Amino acid sequence: MKKIAIQGTLGSYHDIAAHKYFEGEEIELICCANFEDVFTSIRKDSQVIGMLAIENTIAGSLLHNNELLRQSGTQIIGEYKLRISHSFVCLPDENWEDLTEVNSHPIALMQCREFLNQHPQLKVVEGEDTARSAEIIKNENLKGHAAICSKAAAERYGMKVLQEGIETNKHNFTRFLVVADPWQVDELRQHHANATNKASIVL
């Protein structure tokens, strides 16, 4: 079973991308609070594979992740491009008129700016992760709180989906890189032998 370190919790877009990339394989996710911890997981255990967002069609290049990658000594073994579709979700027994606050990752909030502008009554609060925002609302039964996250996260944490596809730009894609310890690269690449070779340059 492959161990995959991701930023975020179960139901996050990193979770979705990891399961799509390793479809048909058994994987165990290591959920990390931040991207630094993804690389720390690889340093602690060379068998761990990392998956991290590197570029978004709306937000652009994630410069911090490029720098972490450059410093890490890991090698890129693959990539996955995921269509990002955000949902507006709340507790199962609540509706639009009950909501006063919306929580999500800053980039997700930015990608849904037009939707949020249509609902000025909602206080916008940044969180560490899209799926984690939904998880906290459900676990702590936070009345009046909504989250912006994936539909998969809503289903995982038992949240009600009030509206799907709330992102401003429907051509919203994130490119994820799959990285590994250099000593594991050859073996891992054999499992994806049909992948197209690419080069990434950080200036």
Q: Where in the sequence are the language-model features?
A:
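Domain-level signature for soluble enzymes in the chorismate/prephenate branch of the shikimate pathway
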Residues: 1-203
